[in-house]
């Protein structure tokens, strides 16, 4: 089976300081993978490289493929990377919505990569596209808020709109960069359950960076832990140990994130969303 994501010898330097060191990684189609690690470990930097939003060092080589197509190599983006991005949904920590537009209009923007540019610039979306956008909002529990301005929603609701936009984009790979970092626990749970449902029901490959290790354990079968720009652990989330987490996070580790047996055996709850 061809990997959905393949990273080979990836290096990245910022202002003379190396952030990623010779990374190699393969993620299979349909996996849900958590990238974990302390702040500054390189997990968000890695995710941006997967989407072609940042380039690796030219001198040290490095290559990234997504869905069997080259994203970048030796510090240069592939000439067709814009087309490839139509198959990569990127969910930002700060939502990246157009807040003056309605919720529905924001979700419709997911279609832009698969329609003529002139139609998109004029907002000429078909009735079928509008139906699909409403179905995506229904799936994330926000159909009744379709006509509201995005600026009126809570942070958790805005993040769910961003996920609905990725659904209309018909992305095969979803990359989520700290999608729950600024959310309250209930909103975070809803967002993670939606991502897990998309992975489970649609077979989409999902890679999510998380600072909250307990969510990685509950929702992601595989964890890749970064420390100082290097992969420190790559394996089942269930095998993460308190000792490893202490090594990763040190004094920054909240004691509540050290797992009890009960937490380790917890299963994600079924997706039951209501508006709000």
From Swiss-Prot:
Enumerate the catalysed reactions. Answer: phosphonate(out) + ATP + H2O = phosphonate(in) + ADP + phosphate + H(+)
Q: What parts of the sequence cross the membrane?
A: none
Q: What is its EC number?
A: 7.3.2.2
Give the Pfam families listed for this entry.
ABC_tran (PF00005)
Keyword check for Transmembrane, yes or no. no
Q: Where in the cell is it found?
A: Cell inner membrane
Protein keywords: ATP-binding, Cell inner membrane, Cell membrane, Membrane, Nucleotide-binding, Phosphonate transport, Translocase, Transport
Cellular component aspect of the GO annotation: plasma membrane
Q: Cite the record's note on assembly.
A: The complex is composed of two ATP-binding proteins (PhnC), two transmembrane proteins (PhnE) and a solute-binding protein (PhnD).
What name goes with this protein? Phosphonates import ATP-binding protein PhnC
Q: Which organism is it from?
A: Stutzerimonas stutzeri
Show the taxonomic lineage: Bacteria, Pseudomonadati, Pseudomonadota, Gammaproteobacteria, Pseudomonadales
């Amino acid at each position: 089976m061809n990997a959905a994501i393949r990273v080979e010898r990836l290096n990245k330097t910022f202002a003379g300081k190396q952030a990623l060191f010779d990374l190699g990684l393969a993620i299979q189609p349909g996996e849900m993978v958590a990238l974990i690690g302390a702040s500054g470990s390189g997990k968000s930097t890695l995710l941006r490289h997967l989407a072609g939003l940042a380039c690796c060092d030219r001198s040290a080589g490095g290559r990234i493929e997504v869905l069997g197509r080259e994203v970048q190599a030796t510090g240069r983006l592939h000439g067709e990377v814009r087309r490839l991005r139509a198959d990569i949904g990127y969910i930002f920590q700060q939502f990246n919505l157009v807040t003056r537009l309605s919720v529905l209009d924001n979700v419709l923007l997911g279609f832009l990569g698969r329609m003529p540019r002139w139609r998109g610039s004029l907002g000429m979306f078909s009735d079928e596209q509008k139906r699909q956008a409403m179905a995506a909002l229904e799936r994330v529990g926000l159909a009744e808020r379709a006509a509201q301005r995005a600026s009126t929603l809570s942070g958790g609701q805005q993040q769910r709109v961003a996920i609905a936009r990725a659904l209309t984009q018909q992305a095969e790979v979803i990359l989520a960069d700290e999608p729950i970092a600024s959310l309250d626990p209930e909103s975070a749970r809803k967002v993670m359950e939606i991502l897990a449902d998309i992975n489970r029901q649609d077979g989409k490959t999902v890679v999510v960076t998380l600072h909250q290790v307990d969510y990685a354990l509950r929702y992601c079968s595989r964890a890749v832990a970064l420390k100082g720009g290097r992969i420190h652990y790559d394996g089942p989330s269930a095998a993460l140990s308190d000792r490893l987490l202490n090594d990763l996070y040190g004094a920054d580790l909240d004691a509540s994130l050290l797992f009890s047996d009960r937490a380790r055996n917890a299963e994600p709850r079924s997706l039951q969303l209501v508006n709000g």
